[in-house]
Amino acid sequence: MDAPRALAAKPPTGRKMKARAPPPPGKPAAQNVHSEQKLPHDATLGSQQSLVYMKEALQNSTLDITVVLPSGLEKQSVVSGSHAMMDLLVELCLQNHLNPSHHVLEIWSSETQQPLSFKPNTLIGSLNVHTVLLKEKVPEERVKPGLTKAPEKSVRLVVNYLRTQKAVVRVSPEVPLQNILPVICAKCEVNPEHVILLRDNVAGEELELSKSLNELGIKELYAWDNRREMFRKSSLGNDETDKEKKKFLGFFKANKRSNSKAEHLGLSGADSDEDPAKSASGGDLNGCVTTPNSPSLHSRSLTLGPSLSLGNISGVSMKSDMKKRRAPPPPSPKLLGQDKVSEKASLSSQADLQKKKRRAPAPPPPQQPPPSPVVPNRKEDKEENRKSTVGVGRQVPQKPPRGTARGPPQLVLPPPPPYPPPDTDVTEPVTFPGEGAGSETSELRPKLSLPLGPGSHCSMGGVSQVPAESEETASEDTTEDSGVMSSPSDAISLDSQQDSMRSKDKWSTDQEDGSDQDLAGTPELGPQKSPSWGKSGSGSSILRTEKATMPTNDDEDLFITGHLHQTLAELDEDLEGMEENYETDTSSLTNSVNGVSNHSLQEAIIPDSGVDDIPVTFIGEVSDEPFDSGLFSSRCNNATTFNTGSIASQRSHLSPSQTEHSQPFVRTSRKEPDPSPPSQDNRKRNQPTLANTSENENPVETDPTVTSLVSKLLIDDPKAKDKGKVHGSSHSEKTQAGHGINSLRVNPRDGKDESSNSAPPPWSHHGQALGGSYGLKYGLTTYKIVPPKSEMRCYDRDVSLSTGAIKIDELGNLVSPHMNGSRTISPPSAVVETDTPPIGKVKEFWRRNSMEKYLNGPAECTIKRAPSTTITATPEKPQQDNGMKAAFTVTTPQQQPASQEYGAHLEEERSRPQSAVSCSVKVPASNPTDITFLKPQRRTSSQYVASAIAKKMGPPKVHADVVRPHKATTEQCHEEAKLARSPPTRKDDAAPNLHSEARQHEHGTNQSSVCLPSNPGVQLPAGGHPKVEVNSTYGKSSTQDYPAAVHRNSYFLPGRSSHRDRVSVGQSCGFNEKQTTSNQKANSTSNFSQALDKAHPPPLLLAEARDSGRILMNGSARTPGNCEPPHSPKESTLTSYIILQTEEKPSSLSTDGQDADDTLPSSIFGPKKKFKPVIQRPLPKDVSLHSALMEAIHSSGGREKLRKTAEQTSEGRPKKPSYVEAESERSALLAAIRGHSGTLSLRKVSSLASEELQSFRNAALGAPGLDKPQQEDLGLPPPPALPPPPAPAPQAPSASVTVSRFSTGTPSNSVNARQALMDAIRSGTGAARLRKVPLLV
C-alpha cells in the first residue's frame, strides 16, 4: 500500500526533471536558485496565510467606490472589502443589467490615479481602490493571414539524349520550350546551341520551341545533339545499335576499339552515331561518352576478315545464346574450315549448329571420328526435324550420352502405326506429313519402333508423329519427344548388356529429357525405361544395339531397311520366346495374368515398360475409359513385372490396322465418361496403370470381354494369376487375332478416335509415360497420383505376387481372372460407354470371380449369409453398397424423396454398429477378411477422387450370424425410415407405416439397414436408371442416376439372387415399404441391385433376376419359391403379418399410390413418375391414426380397415385411455373416433354425433383437394383452430357439425374444424383435448 501511495504522491517525473533542471554554473547561481526555489514555497504559504488573515480582517470592512459605467454615468456604491474583483464585476453588471462576459473592471488608485493591476481573486479591501471603471471589452481584431500562394504547377519531363540516356527535369508545363531548354541542356550536359528538341528519336519530328508542354501534349522528348549525333535519322532508327550499346558495359573500351577499327577500315562513321575521331579523343562529348561509337556487330563481322567460316558466320548471325552453345567447341570446328565438311557446314541450318552444340562433346565410341559427327548430325537433324524426336531446335547443354543413344532412336523416331511383324513394307508407307525425306526414315522407324515400342514414339505407332516441320519447331518444346525417342533406344540399350553403360547414361539423359518432356507432355506412350525392358529379351536389346550402330553408317537407310526385316523376324522369335519367358517368370505370372492386356497392349506397342506406376497424364480421360480398372491397376501393380518388350514385340506382330484400332480404343476408353462414380475409383486405381495402360490402352479396350478378362486376371490372386498365365496367354492370342476385330468392335466408339489417330493422337501424348523415372512429371494435365494402395493388397497381401497387383480375398471374389472372360455389357446406358464402365467391368469381374469361388468354397458363406441377404448382395462392391443403398431408397422415383429422408435415418442407423444391411451390402468379400480389405477401400474412397468402388466395397460386412440378430432391428429400421418418409410419399401407407413403426418400437433396436421402400404400383421403367440414393456407411448419401455402371456393380452372384428373391418376396407381400428384416436387407441390397439390374441387367444376371422375381409389379410381384432364401421365423411372421395388413387395407394403401402410379407410363419396374423430395420428419406415433381416420372419412367404407389398423398399432404401443362417457355425446363421439367404430357407432350413440360425423364427411367431400394436401402435410401437425369462447361440451360437436355442414362451400372453415380434430387425435390428447378446444367457427 505504501508504494502505490508514494507513486501517487510523486509528481510526474517529467515535470520534476524540468523543475530541477541543472542550475547555471557557479555557486552563487546555485544559491540563488535554491533561494528562489524556497522563496516561492514560503511566499505561497505566507500569501495563503495572509489571505486568510486579510479576509478575516476585511470581512467586516466596507469601501466606498465610484463606479463609472460604460455609458460614462458615475455611480457611488458601497462594497465589502472581502469581495474579490471578479465578484465585484459580476455584482456591478447585475446591478446595471450588463453582461459580465462583455465587460471588464479597471481600477484607479486614489493616490496615484493610475490603473492598478489585479487578479480576479484579489480582494477589493487589499487594494487602494478609489474608482472602478466598468468598460466593454473591445474584440481584438485578428489579422487574417493572406491567402497562401499556390505553388507553381510543374511536371516531370523525361529527356532522352544520346539515344540511350535519360534525364528527368521538373519544369512548368505552361512555359514555352525555349524557356525550358537551358534547364534541359544543363541536365544533359550539352550545349544549347547544338540541341534540337525532337518528339522522339524514331520519327525525328522537331518540336516548336514557342509551344509549351501542355500545348504539345508531351511529357517526354528527345534532345538531339546535332554535333554529336551526325546521322540522326539512320542512327535514331537503328535499334540494333541501341541494343549493342546497351549490351556493352565497357563503353570506353568498346568505343576505342570500334573507333580504331572503323578508322582502320576507312569507315567514316556511317554506322557510328558520333564522329569517331571526336569520340576517340573525347572532344565535344561534353563528358557524355556513354555510347559505343560504332556498332560492334558490323565492326566485328568486318574484322573477321576473309575467314568467313561457318563458325564465324554463325557468330555474326547467331545470337548470344547461340554463342553460348558454341562455347564448348566440338572437335570438328577446325576441320570445318579445312575440309569439305566446312563447306557443308556453312550450308547447314542453324538447327544443325544447335544440334552440333548438343553433340559437341565427343560422341560415345559408337559414333565415328570427329569429322563424321558433323554429317551424321545433319542427317540426324533431318530425321529429328521430321520426327521432332530429337528436339531439333532445343538449346540445351550437350548431353553426350543422349547423343549416342539418339543415333538409333533418331531413325526410329517417327513411329509408324503398329507394324505387323513381317509387314515392314506396310509399316514403311505409313509416314506422317512433313516427313518429306522420310520414306527411308519411315522404313527405319518401323524397325526401330518395334524394339523401341516401350519408350519410343513408335511404340504408340505414331503417337508423337507430327508433320516434320511442326515437329522441328515443337521439338524444342516437346523435348519430351527427343527425350522419349532417346529413351526408347535407351530402354532397349538397357536390355543389351553391351549398351548397359550407355543405357545408364541415357537413363539419366532421358530423365533429364523427361523433365523437359514434362513441359510438353511428351506424347510418347511407352514408359521409357521400365525394368521390364530388361526382361523384354536379348533380341530386342540386340536390335537396339544394332540400331545404335546402324546410324553411324552413311547408308543408314539401306542398312536400317535391311535390319528392319531382320529385326522383324527376330522380334517374332523374341516375342514367342519372351512370352514363354514371361510365363516362366514370377513377374511373368502377373504378366501372363495380364496376358490379355499384354496382347492387347501389343496393339499399343507400348508395353507396360512404362509401368513405372507413372500415372498417365490424362487423369480425366482415365475415368472415361471403359477399361477394367482392375486391368489397369493390375498393370500398374504388375507393371514392373510386365515384359514390355514382349508387349512391344507382340504389338509389332499386330497389323498396323489393329494397332490403329487399338489406339482409338485407348482414346475412346479415356473419352468415354464412366457414368458411375465407382469408375472414378477405378480411375484412381487405374491411373497409375493408365500411365502404363495409356500405352496398353489400345488393347485394353479392344474387347469388353478381353478387358473384363484382363481385369479379372489382374485382379485375381496369385492363383488367379497362374490361371491367368494360361488363360491370359490364350486370351492374348485371341486378342492378337481378335485385336483387329475387337478394336473394330470397339471402334464404333473409337472410329472418332481413329480419325484423330491419323494425327498424333492427343491421347498418345497423354498416355505416353514420359521420362523413364519422371513418370509423374508430364506436361499436359499430369496429376501426380499416388497409386491407390491396391484393393487387392487389402484382400490378401500374403497371396499377392506383385506388390501392386489386385489380390483376391479368401472368398476369392477377385480370384479367377478367366472365370468370366466375357463381360456382359449392360444394356446401353445413358452413358457414352458402349462397354460397361471400367468399374462395372471390374465389379463384374470381381463378382464372377467371387461367383466361382462362391460356387466352390464361398458358397457356404453365401448360404450362411443368405438369411442376411445383404451379404450376398455385397459381392457387388462398395459401389454396389452405395448403389444398393441408393437403390433401396430409390426403387421408385417417388420414393426417392422419402428415401432420402429415409436414407438419413438409414445412415443414422448405419452409424450404429448393427448396420446389417449396409454392411451386408458391402459384403463383396463376405468375410471379416473382406472387412479388412474394405476398410482400406474406405480410406481409398476418402483419399482418392470419386472412389465409388472403394465406397461400395469399403463398409465392413456383417456376418450371417450378426445379420440375423439384426434382422428384426433392420426391419424396424426400415419400417421407421419408411414411416418417416412414406407418409409424405403416400398417404395411404401411413397406417402400414405406423404398424412398421410399432414393430420397430417393439423390437426397440435400430439397425442400419437399407430399406427399399417400393411403393406398390411403382414400377421402375426397364430403361430407366432408378435414381439411387447411396447411403454409405460413411454417412454420405449421394443420389445418383446409376446407369450401366451401377447395374454392373449391382450384378449379383448366385447367392445374391436368393437375396434378391427375398427382397422380391417382401415386395410381393405387398408391404413394399415394410419388408422383413432379412427381406428388407435383401430387398435393400437386392432391390437396389434389382432396380439397377432391371434398368441394365447384365445378360447373365437377367435370367437370375427374373428367377429371383426382381420384377416388382405394384409391390405384388411374386417371387419363385427359390427366390425366398431362408427367412428367420420372425421374418416369415413379419412378412405374413405385413401381407395381412396390406391385404386388409388394400384400398387405402393402393388407392392413391397406385392411381398416381397408374396414370404414369410404367414399366415392369415401376412408374417413371418423380416426386419432389419432401422434407420429412419422424411423425408422432398417432400419425397413422390420423391417416386411418382420414381414409375412413374419405372412403366411408374402411371402418373395418381402420379398426384393424388401430388394433395393429395398438399392439406396438400402449393403448391410450379411452375416455368413454355414455352420458356425454361428445365423449361418445370421441370414443367412436378412437375406436374407429365408424359412422355406425356414432349414429347409434346420438343424432348429434352422427350429424357431426356426416358434416366431416361432407367437408371432406367438398374439399377433397384440401384433404390430400393436408394429409401430405401431416408430417407437421396443423395449428389447431383458435379456441372460440368455451361452449358446453355436448354442444361443441353439434356446433362444429353445423358449421362444417354450412362451410362445405367454404373449405377453409371445414379445414379448420377438421384440422383441430386431427390435431387432437394426432397429439394423442384424446377427448381431453377436444373438450378444451370446442370447434365453434
From Swiss-Prot:
The keyword Cell membrane applies. Residues 288-317, 484-500, 647-666, 687-710, 1070-1090, 1297-1310 have a biased composition (Polar residues). One of its GO terms (cellular component) is cell cortex. Residues 526-541 have a biased composition (Low complexity). SMART domains: WH2. Residues 361-374, 411-423, 1276-1291 have a biased composition (Pro residues). It is a peripheral membrane protein. Detected in brain cortex and in the Purkinje cell layer in the cerebellum. Detected in hippocampus neurons, and at lower levels in testis, lung and spleen (at protein level). Detected in embryonic neural tube. Residues 1185-1205, 1225-1245, 1313-1333 form the WH2 domain. A motif (KKRRAP 2) lies at residues 356-361. The modification Phosphothreonine is found at T522. Residues 1-41, 260-556, 647-768, 892-923, 967-991, 1070-1094, 1113-1133, 1145-1168, 1192-1221, 1262-1310 are annotated as: Disordered. One of its GO terms (molecular function) is actin monomer binding. Residues 469-480 have a biased composition (Acidic residues). CDD domains: WH2_Wa_Cobl, WH2_Wb_Cobl, WH2_Wc_Cobl. It holds the Pfam family WH2. A motif (KKRRAP 1) lies at residues 323-328. Identified in a complex composed of COBL, PACSIN1 and WASL. Interacts with PACSIN1, PACSIN2 and PACSIN3. Identified in a complex composed of ACTA1, COBL, GSN and TMSB4X. Interacts (via WH2 domains) with actin monomers. Interacts with DBNL. This is Protein cordon-bleu. It comes from Mus musculus (Mouse).
